[in-house]
Amino acid sequence: MDKFYNYNSSSHQALLSFKVKPNSKQNLISNFVIINNIPYLKLSIKAIPEQGKANEEIINYLAKEWKLSRSNIEIIKGHTHSLKTILIKNINEDYLNWIINSYIK
């Protein structure tokens, strides 16, 4: 099984894979799921998937949850799909590991 994230130490950037469920009761990251032998963090978002509302809420939620600037979070793949790749900029590896370990159960 591959990891659901990759870290580039020279650029201090990370790519994370998410399986997003919009129109949920609450915003929540809950462990991970395997789809076609690929792991994804499960992310529930309250916003509906219309006109970019869910994508905007994903960025807002991750920035608040992880105490990062919104400008350091970017959806780079899956804008109109539930499987998304998100780029996190300006993050050190220790902080990323702390984030990741808080969701692995």
Curated annotation (Swiss-Prot):
PANTHER family to which the protein is assigned, alphabetical: UPF0235 PROTEIN C15ORF40
Entry superkingdom: Bacteria
Listed SMART domains: DUF167
UniProt xrefs under NCBIfam families: DUF167 family protein, PRK01530.1
GO cellular component: cytoplasm
Name recorded for this polypeptide: UPF0235 protein RPR_04990
One Pfam family here: DUF167
The family this protein is said to belong to: Belongs to the UPF0235 family.
Disulphide connectivity of cysteines: none
InterPro entries: DUF167, YggU-like_sf
